[in-house]
Amino acid sequence: MTDFDLMNFPFHERLDSPVSENGEIKDGEPIPQNWLNENHVGKSILPLFVNPEDVINCNFSNARDSYEENKSPSMDQMNYARNTSYQESPGLQERPKNEKDKSPIGTDVHKKDVPNFIHSTPRENSSKHFTRANEQASAQPTDEHTSPDISIEDCNGAKIFLQNSLSKEDFRMLENVILGYQKKVIELGRDNLRQEERANSLQKELEAATKSNDKTLDNKKKIEEQTVLIENLTKDLSLNKEMLEKANDTIQTKHTALLSLTDSLRKAELFEIPIGILFFDLYDSEENSSKLDHILQEKYPNIKGFLCASQQEELSRISQRFKNAKAEAEDLRNELENKKIEIQTMREKNNTLIGTNKTLSKQNKILCDKFDKLTIDEKEILKGCNEEIKIKLERLNERLGSWEKSKEKYETSLKDKEKMLADAEKKTNTLSKELDNLRSRFGNLEGNTSERITIKNILQSRPDISAEECNFLMVEQIDSANLTTLQNTVKEIVLAVGIPYPKLRRKIPLLAIKLKYENIMLSNFAQRLHRQVYSQEMNLKKFTDQAYYDFMSTRRMDSIDHHLERCLDHLYDHILEKMVK
């Protein structure tokens, strides 16, 4: 057996022994020819090194001696004694008396030399009878004068000591197990007789096999590396799948929220104008500008602007935040696609490794069938391969540590991505709140559109006003004026006429009557009277310009020195003087 075979031992499987768990031999079932080679190697190797004749002749206890004296040798024992020459195995040896008082430290040091496949492999099912006997022996009180301890030698010559204070039932159970193995050894002896005739041909095959042994060792190394790599890749793949599913769910929710945000923003209107589409036109444009002025002026030439400058700056900031959020979402989507591509490549590598592993396992099976027949050379190869196996296991442990470090790096990177997603979610929430606030402010600024005064309403409510007069007065241009201009105009009117704002709409007709009728009639009367008295007209335009100049220089209505007042005073004094005379 080579180190290549040991690396492929099915240590985790249970030994399919013809001896049942209760110690009875299954005589009804035939023992296969290659039972030892196929099922026993690597699973429970300890009974191979137990000589049943030593166990029968060993003095375990007084009860055992009396039992052996009255018991006749069985057919299996006689067959085993006849075929002992074909089976080489170390037997049970009595522990020397001078080793009884040795400290347990020496025993522990001695056990360290035992190969790893004896001490560390899980063979709970196959060695159940030995462990059960040891547990019952440890529970019973010991006596100083009991029979000496028993030691078992492994393939390297190292001794493994067993407890000897066992009961009669435990020894019967042990005997049944040993007899079962005797039966297997007898069958193997018969096979060895048949195989002896083919020794010459097998010797030639052995020479060819030794030449290809180096290639087999290389293949074995590749299989070891690939199996460990496949296991690590499958674990990493499962973890990456779970993390990617979580990331996909979070990104999907963020994407749906972003789509709903873009849809609501696309449907946004201002003064019956689809202003939301303008944001997307600006985003799709090649110019690196964050202002909607040129796009708005191209589509709606009559519109000069919306709201004040501060609110426009606020809207531009909101659009910039929206662009940043969209860019971050696109980056996350691209990163997710890259992760999917990496997982696909890893999956393809895994499939290729599985295929190579299958082919190598087939080759391994063919070589194992040849090497199983060469039991003598197996022991020599086994001794030289123990150190190599230890070195390889250390290398595999180092690789496992590196894979764990890379796994931790992936986990930290995924946590960072989750934090970025949480920050993006917070940003989208703040943007949605700001958008709702802007919508509410837009609604308050727009007011009730059903009460808006249009040219149609003017023509219906004022028959004295025509459409040409409305065009001359540029009434429609008022609808395109911004809020600040309209507010300033109304304030100037209120301050100029001295009427409170709540009474302004009600007293506007009175102002119109005074301006269009009463003031004109009074000015005509004064002009006619002045012409009659002085034979010339008053220069009212000059008086008005002088009063306007005084107001603009002082910005005070009470400080205007209107020349019309002096002119009318002189006219009144002159008429009064004429009337008195």
Curated annotation (Swiss-Prot):
This is Chaotic nuclear migration protein 67. Its main location: cytoplasm. GO terms for biological process: cell division; meiotic cell cycle; mitotic spindle organization; regulation of microtubule nucleation; spindle pole body organization; sporulation resulting in formation of a cellular spore. It comes from Saccharomyces cerevisiae (strain ATCC 204508 / S288c) (Baker's yeast). One of its GO terms (molecular function) is structural constituent of cytoskeleton. Residues 179-252, 306-363, 373-451 form a coiled coil. Interacts directly with ADY3 and YOR129C. Interacts with ADY4. Probable component of a SPB complex composed of ADY3, SSP1, DON1, MPC54, SPO21/MPC70, NUD1 and CNM67. The gene is CNM67. Transmembrane segments: none annotated. The lineage of its organism: Eukaryota, Fungi, Dikarya, Ascomycota, Saccharomycotina. Phosphorylated in its N-terminal part. InterPro entries: Sid4-like (IPR021750). Residues 86-150 are annotated as: Disordered. It holds the Pfam family SID. The keyword Cell division applies. It is found in: Cytoplasm, Cytoskeleton, Microtubule organizing center, Spindle pole body. Involved in the pathway that organizes the shaping and sizing of the prospore membrane (PSM) during sporulation. Required for the proper formation of the spindle pole body (SPB) outer plaque. May connect the outer plaque to the central plaque embedded in the nuclear envelope. It comes from the Eukaryota.
